[in-house]
């Protein structure tokens, strides 16, 4: 609503608004409005032609009445007439009315479009701005059809004023978001990119927003924006530059533009080393400025400064390729963890969750564990405590799992009810994933049920039963522990379920102790029977019949219970049926038949943890960019152990229906993939067969990404505007398992999605790869997983190629990347004393056993990063072995199916010359050569 001014005020409008405000009741307001509507209608229909001022005044009144919630069914034509006025205030009110009241189905839409086109063609910047604002405000598909071809011309025209360019860029962005198919790409795209060099802050800021959105679906059209964006960012953040210094906001130059440029650069990893180096300098400068004392105490200064810093950290995390920057970002975020500003603490915790998934920064994140635990205990804001829980979950590994699980259990007792179930799932996952001693796992889950039994879902207690059944070494301890837990006066029903199942299977393992004799076990369980729900009672009845088989001495007691009226005449059909059938079975079946029917449950088949699946579902639909679980200690081993399963093509036997008395086939089987071809050789997928379709050459940047995975196992292998490929892998001796995640970054389905692993003739005999097919349809925004089992038969020098073919929007897509399965993945670290090391070093002194490489450092020579890379390479890092403390010494064994190959390495850095000398000695020349090539490329 325009302000009332003396020069162009509408006194009648001001009086009408005052009258409405002074109304004492709803009826009085309606009466006054109806009176005014009658007056306006008579003026519009009168014989006397109204001047522009009167039309404007009456249209404003109609607009005000509409905003009060009353329908307006006239005055539209008068508003359209105002669009033809040459007076700004009249045209402004006309556009305001059109933007608010006229819909796309109006009969006047043709007249409105003509008026907008006339204003766009007028070259009057004020009128052009009004027209563009109207198009953006309406933003309908009809508007896009009418003007999507016109606005780019206005945007790139040489004589368009800066204010109009800014409006045109934002208007085009609005139309593209509502109707992307109606905005044609063309010659104008290259000219829009050059707006990144514009000297007007509004133009370059609007253009950056537009380019960022357009580039996400049209990457090829806008790839030239990378160098321009880096150059502009460099000029802004470098203090020596004067670029946009007039737009300094509280001592921070162009902060919002910097944020948008950093966000644009997340779309494209810089392919050119020079551009990448300049971007790294920019990011280092931003991190350095964050360490400087504030130039102002005002909150606006810190807000602007931190906005740029957090966006820079997001870019560093997204690229995940600069160890130094990642560690520095982590240290900077660590300072924010104790900041007095709650929002900064929240953002720091959120960003560190992502940093924890990087191989390079995981250890740096772990150094802040005490601060995060303290935040969990002392934070007042529940959302910050939630982020602290997320960060503890993300930073957890085998070294700190007991501490983190204990802290999360402690917090669970006082946690907000809204997040308890999620914490329960995370504790259950961590306890299983990092359990070295499975007695600790059993204790943790039982403690979890005790503290938060109402929030322990079926998936959690199903899972503990699966693991106990699959691991012989923990069965006796589990039976003893649940027996002791059930002796508490008040037990949660989930504990009764777990106790009933485990004692029914393994109660015999503790029956030799008089304190847990069969009869005592039965009476303990039966004392809980009448307090439980029907499903739990059904489970306990199944436990009783198992006791009949395990302990013949309690058979009469159990038969009396089954024979009682409360069971045989139970109102619940399921309980009645079980009682009748179990009683009959215990009466007529011989001992051998009873033992066969009620035999111990076989191990559960291997599959993804249903708890992990439930947590993913609870966190919402998985986004492609959120590889939250891509963490250092790989995936959960579904049979409860840390060892990867050996590659095998044999089917896993599943329990028969008769044996699954308690219905504990907990997680539904994964959806079956396409059936194997009839000509197949028995493998689920013939990964070595020649595909009829043409395999694409390696994608740009594939070799760089491949090199990044030599010293790490998790991360994003490939990413373009359509597809993201993430990896999680684990290796033990000559076996490995790799989880490949294919993420659809678009809103459109991928059809005929077919990933294929290709091995060369030289590689095929030395490396066995076996996998299963994936669903040929990948929904928009969804992610599918593929598991590859790996066996190293003999040493090798090449890497397999992953080829992905699919259809997107009717277009065939073909992508090939190298899969980072390298010889060092089968490296097992070996600790050696100094004397043993040099003795072995001398034994490997033949010329063919040693390979040496002297090379220039490609990255900053940082001691901690070097140590992390050597350890990530697979070697043990031997301390105090080399007489020169600046040198690095390592040892390990390459495991293959046919042999084991010992390996010793020595890395000598020369800081002054910025050079390295790497020496490797193994018993096999080809192995020495390959390991030297792989490790040299990391420095």
Swiss-Prot record:
Q: Name one GO biological process term.
A: intracellular protein transport
Q: Where is this region: Disordered?
A: 612-681
Q: Which Gene3D superfamilies match?
A: 2.60.40.1230, Leucine-rich Repeat Variant, TATA-Binding Protein
Localization annotation: Cell membrane; Membrane, Coated pit
One GO MF term on file is:
disordered domain specific binding
Membrane topology term reads: Peripheral membrane protein
Q: Tell me a GO cellular component.
A: presynapse
Family statement drawn from the similarity comment of this UniProt entry: Belongs to the adaptor complexes large subunit family.
Q: Briefly state the protein's biological role.
A: Component of the adaptor protein complex 2 (AP-2). Adaptor protein complexes function in protein transport via transport vesicles in different membrane traffic pathways. Adaptor protein complexes are vesicle coat components and appear to be involved in cargo selection and vesicle formation. AP-2 is involved in clathrin-dependent endocytosis in which cargo proteins are incorporated into vesicles surrounded by clathrin (clathrin-coated vesicles, CCVs) which are destined for fusion with the early endosome.
List the protein's name.
AP-2 complex subunit alpha-2
Q: Specify the taxonomic lineage.
A: Eukaryota, Metazoa, Chordata, Craniata, Vertebrata
């Amino acid at each position: 609503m325009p302000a009332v001014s003396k020069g162009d005020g509408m006194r009648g409008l001001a009086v009408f608004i005052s009258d409405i405000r002074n109304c004492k009741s709803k009826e009085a307001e309606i009466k006054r409005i109806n009176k005014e509507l009658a007056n306006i209608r008579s003026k519009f229909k009168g014989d006397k032609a109204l001047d522009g001022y009167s039309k404007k005044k009456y249209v404003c009144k109609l607009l005000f009445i509409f905003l009060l919630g009353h329908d307006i069914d006239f005055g539209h034509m008068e508003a359209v007439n105002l669009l033809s006025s040459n007076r700004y205030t009249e045209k402004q009110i006309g556009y305001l009315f059109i933007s608010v009241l006229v819909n796309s189905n109006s009969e006047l839409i043709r007249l409105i479009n003509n008026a907008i086109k006339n204003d766009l063609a007028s070259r009057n910047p004020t009128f052009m701005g009004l027209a563009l604002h109207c198009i953006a405000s309406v933003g309908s598909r009809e508007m896009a059809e009418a003007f999507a071809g016109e606005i780019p011309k206005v945007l790139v025209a040489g004589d368009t004023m800066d204010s109009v360019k800014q409006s045109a860029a934002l208007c085009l962005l609005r139309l593209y978001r509502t109707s992307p198919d109606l905005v044609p790409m063309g010659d104008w795209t290259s000219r829009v990119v050059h707006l990144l060099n514009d000297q007007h802050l509004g133009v370059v800021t609007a253009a950056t927003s537009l380019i960022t959105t357009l580039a996400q679906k049209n990457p090829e059209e806008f790839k030239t924006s990378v160098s321009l964006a880096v150059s502009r960012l460099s000029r802004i953040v470098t203090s020596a530059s004067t670029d946009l210094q007039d737009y300094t906001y509280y001592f921070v130059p162009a902060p919002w533009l910097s944020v948008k440029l950093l966000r644009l650069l997340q779309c494209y990893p810089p392919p050119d080393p020079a551009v990448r180096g300049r971007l790294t300098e920019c990011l280092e400068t931003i991190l350095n400025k964050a360490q400087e004392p504030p130039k102002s105490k005002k909150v606006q200064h810190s807000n602007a400064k931190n906005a740029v810093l957090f966006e820079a950290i997001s870019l560093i995390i997204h690229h995940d390729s600069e160890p130094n920057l990642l560690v520095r970002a982590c240290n900077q975020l660590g300072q924010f963890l104790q900041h007095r500003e709650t929002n900064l603490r929240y953002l720091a915790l959120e960003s560190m969750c992502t940093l924890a998934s990087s191989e390079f920064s995981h250890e740096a994140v772990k150094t802040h564990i005490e601060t995060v635990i303290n935040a969990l205990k002392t934070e007042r804001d529940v959302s910050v405590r939630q982020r602290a829980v997320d960060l503890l979950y993300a930073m957890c590994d085998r070294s700190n799992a007991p501490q983190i699980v204990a802290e999360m259990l402690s917090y669970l007792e006082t946690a907000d009810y809204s997040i308890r179930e999620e914490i329960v799932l995370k504790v259950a996952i961590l306890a299983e994933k990092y359990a070295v001693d499975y007695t600790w796992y059993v204790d943790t889950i039982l403690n979890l049920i005790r503290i938060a039994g109402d929030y322990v879902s079926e998936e959690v207690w199903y899972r503990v039963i699966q693991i106990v059944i699959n691991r012989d070494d923990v069965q006796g301890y589990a039976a003893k522990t649940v027996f002791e837990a059930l002796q508490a006066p008040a037990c949660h029903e989930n504990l009764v379920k777990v106790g009933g199942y485990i004692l029914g299977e393994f109660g015999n393992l503790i029956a030799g102790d008089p304190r847990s004799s069969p009869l005592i076990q039965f009476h303990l369980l039966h004392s809980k029977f009448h307090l439980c729900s029907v499903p739990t009672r059904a489970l306990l009845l199944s436990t009783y019949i198992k006791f009949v088989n395990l302990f013949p001495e309690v058979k009469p007691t159990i038969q009396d219970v089954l024979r009682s009226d409360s069971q045989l005449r139970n109102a619940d059909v399921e309980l009645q049926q079980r009682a009748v059938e179990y009683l009959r079975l215990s009466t007529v079946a011989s001992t051998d038949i009873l033992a066969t029917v009620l035999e111990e449950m076989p191990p559960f088949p291997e599959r993804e943890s249903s708890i992990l699946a439930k947590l993913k579902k609870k966190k919402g639909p998985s986004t492609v960019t959120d590889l939250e679980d891509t963490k250092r200690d790989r995936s959960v081993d579904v049979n409860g152990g840390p060892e990867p399963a050996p590659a095998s093509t044999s089917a896993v036997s599943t329990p028969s229906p008769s044996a699954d008395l308690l219905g504990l086939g907990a997680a539904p089987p994964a959806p079956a993939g396409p059936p194997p071809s009839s000509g197949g050789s028995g493998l689920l997928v013939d990964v070595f067969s020649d595909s009829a379709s043409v395999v694409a050459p390696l994608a740009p940047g594939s070799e760089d990404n491949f090199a990044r995975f030599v010293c790490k196992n998790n991360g994003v292998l490939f990413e373009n505007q359509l597809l993201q490929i993430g990896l999680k892998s684990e290796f033990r001796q000559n076996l490995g398992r790799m989880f490949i995640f294919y993420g659809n970054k678009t809103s459109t389905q991928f059809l005929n999605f077919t990933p294929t692993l290709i091995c060369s003739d030289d590689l095929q005999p030395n490396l066995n790869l076996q996998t299963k097919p994936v669903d040929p349809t990948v929904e928009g925004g969804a992610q599918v997983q593929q598991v590859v089992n790996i066996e190293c038969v003999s040493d090798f020098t090449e890497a397999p190629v992953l080829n992905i073919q699919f259809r997107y929007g009717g277009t065939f897509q073909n992508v090939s990347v190298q899969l980072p399965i390298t010889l060092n993945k089968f490296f097992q670290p070996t600790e050696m004393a100094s004397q043993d090391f040099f003795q072995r070093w001398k034994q490997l002194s033949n010329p063919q056993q040693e390979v040496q490489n002297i090379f220039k450092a490609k990255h900053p020579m940082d001691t901690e990063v070097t140590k992390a890379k050597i350890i990530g390479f697979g070697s043990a890092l031997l301390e105090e072995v080399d007489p020169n403390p600046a040198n690095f010494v390592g040892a390990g064994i390459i495991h293959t199916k046919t042999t084991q190959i010992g390996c010793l390495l020595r890395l000598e850095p020369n800081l002054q010359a910025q050079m390295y000398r790497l020496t490797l000695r193994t018993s096999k020349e080809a192995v020495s050569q390959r390991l030297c090539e792989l490790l040299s490329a990391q420095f």
